[in-house]
Amino acid sequence: MRKPSLKLSFSDMVGDFPYHTAIYTNTADIFELEHLLQALPDVAFHVLAHSHFGFNLVKLEQYPNLILYPSFDPLTSRKVLEKIDFYLDINPFDEVDHITETIHQLGLPIFSFEGTNHDQTGQNQVFKNDQVDQMVKAVRDYIDTIER
């Protein structure tokens, strides 16, 4: 796993991607993550976990748009949430830190699959598990509306 230098700022560590998303997880098996990383190379994927990451996730660091935050702290979480444009609810197991509620409070859209959806409000966009390309299109359509 890449180790960030303590002398680098948060912006230096995440690079100059035009768009940012986050995934809070407690597993190394994030649903369709590799497909999404490939299909959305201009989106930085910030993946946060309260523990260390397993091999299935660490091996995806070959993609420059994947940034892993093992054993994250509240300050790191806040900095990531200040940077993201949307949230991907694609963690297939238990929700971490009631993150969908936090994302709704921030007024950001959430994209998820039927098998990973943790939101009970009906405010997010839910796709069938085999509709990865449709999710990519919806994300593209959304980020095209963001003014920079």
Model-assigned labels for residue ranges:
Residues 24-27, 68-71, 94, 129-133:
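Conserved phosphate-coordination/catalytic loops
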Residues 3-62, 71-74:
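Conserved catalytic-core segment of nucleotide-activated headgroup transferases in glycan assembly
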Residues 61-64, 82:
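Structured loop/turn residues at beta-strand edges in well-structured enzyme cores
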Residues 65-67, 124-125:
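Short, conserved active-site loop motifs that form the nucleotide-linked donor/cofactor pocket
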Residues 85-147:
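Catalytic binding pocket for nucleotide-activated donors in carbohydrate/polymer assembly enzymes
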Residues 43, 64-66, 108:
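A structural micro-motif
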Residues 50-51, 66-80, 94-96:
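Conserved active-site histidine-acidic residue motif and adjacent donor-binding/catalytic loop
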Residues 36, 80, 102:
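Hydrophobic/aromatic ligand-binding patch that stacks against planar heteroaromatic rings
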